[in-house]
Amino acid sequence: MKILFAVSECTPFVKSGGLADVAGALPKALARLGNEVAVMLPKYSQIPEPWKKRMKKQAECTVAVGWRQQYCGIEHMAENDVNYYFIDNEYYFNRDSLYGHYDDGERFAFFSRAVLEAAKVVNVQADIVHTHDWHTAMVNYLLKEEYRKHPFYERMKSVLTIHNLQFQGIFPPDVTHDLLGLEMDHFHYERLECNGFVNFMKAGIIAADHVTTVSPTYRNEIMTPYYGEQLEQVLQYREDDVTGILNGIDDTFYQPKSDPYIEAQYDSGDLACKLENKTKLQQRMGLPEKNDIPLISMVTRLTKQKGLDLVRRIMHELLEEQDIQLVVLGTGEREFEDYFRYAEFAFHEKCRAYIGFDEPLAHQIYAGSDMFLMPSKFEPCGLGQLIALQYGAIPIVRETGGLYDTVRAYQEEEGTGNGFTFSAFNAHDLKFTIERALSFYCQQDVWKSIVKTAMNADYSWGKSAKEYQRIFEQVTRSGRDVLE
């Protein structure tokens, strides 16, 4: 099967969030299943020079953005049995950040059409075009409404994966004609219109032959008003064509047995080496070197979505009452950055905050932590808890989205489970759950059993890739056009 990924970011080239991890790992996993896989993404200025030097110019064309014709260069490189095509346009992609610009609607209207035009130019006649989030959701719509009428595209099917429904690509009505080049009758509640605006995510949802989300629980949650971000009725209409598939992690990159970033490699049969990583982390962060003190960590975007309101309400009291250490790595909203700076000042012997992102340090934190805190308000899938499980840092999470699907609460009677969970989004329950985890940490035989259970499970992309393969095969067998 020929599969074309259309993504706005992709590791190892450029990353702002978890979407890049999926776009980096899933194509490789599908290629290992015998598929012919290509990935198209913008050639951002942020891509490191060593990667740019490996790119070879393949072709160029022009792409319509409304009434204008814009240059589109197509550069190519192959890596891990995947063909990568980089869409080059200095005006749109030579910016100081990937997103957050006044003309993001224009940038990704261009990119969406460029994907389809470039596919023909370089002869990537895919069976499946797999798009991700609002940035490429318009590819699904343009394919259905316009390109499918041409022989090259007539057999192409499309799948949209929703990574985070909160971000939808919402723009003024004139985007319909001025940027997308579509007649204004497309600006209609059964098509692009949502609450008086053009909504790229909605366009993808209604036009894709199938929609996936990044966990089964998140799939069910977004059908409800609380999580549906005003698109729950659209999703309910497509309910039979929406599937939740858990993300995996790249277990060659996140692998404690061979991780070059950590002090001592280890596995579930050699947990003494995990303690070496804990000592090294304490040294690096300037914390007292005490192996018997539980070290709790967070590697996260510092935002309300990640449950940091709850953390802020209980952390002062917890650090005063408990003999623990806390290490935080991340950037985000100023109020939370300032809070963790304050916490480090107020509890200098117990707390350290690295405001920024450092990939080697992230690995060292996973390897050196005893527990990993992730009390998200909502979490479509979450990669942090999967990496933590892989490294034997036991997750403490709220039961939502992919956290509910991947972290099983420890049951003392049966001796089962790989973490600690709570349901209601409130600070009291979070504090109680942390205290419960701390009580089991004191029982070292029990704790080692929990750690081994966590580390011995398979969090790779193998199983998930097979589920995507099944969806793709199902879609290609179907002759139904969802917009008919």
From Swiss-Prot:
InterPro entries, per the entry: Glyco_trans_1, GS/SS, Starch_synth_cat_dom
UniProtKB keywords: Glycogen biosynthesis, Glycosyltransferase, Transferase
Binding site for ADP-alpha-D-glucose: K15
SUPFAM superfamilies: UDP-Glycosyltransferase/glycogen phosphorylase (SSF53756)
Superkingdom: Bacteria
Disulfide topology: none
Catalytic activity: [(1->4)-alpha-D-glucosyl](n) + ADP-alpha-D-glucose = [(1->4)-alpha-D-glucosyl](n+1) + ADP + H(+)
EC number: 2.4.1.21
Pfam families noted in UniProt: Glyco_transf_5, Glycos_transf_1
Keyword flag Transferase: yes
This protein's pathway: Glycan biosynthesis; glycogen biosynthesis
GO molecular function: alpha-1,4-glucan glucosyltransferase (ADP-glucose donor) activity; alpha-1,4-glucan glucosyltransferase (UDP-glucose donor) activity
GO biological process, alphabetically ordered: glycogen biosynthetic process
The family this protein is said to belong to: Belongs to the glycosyltransferase 1 family. Bacterial/plant glycogen synthase subfamily.
Described function: Synthesizes alpha-1,4-glucan chains using ADP-glucose.
Protein name (record): Glycogen synthase
Organism for this UniProt entry: Bacillus subtilis (strain 168)
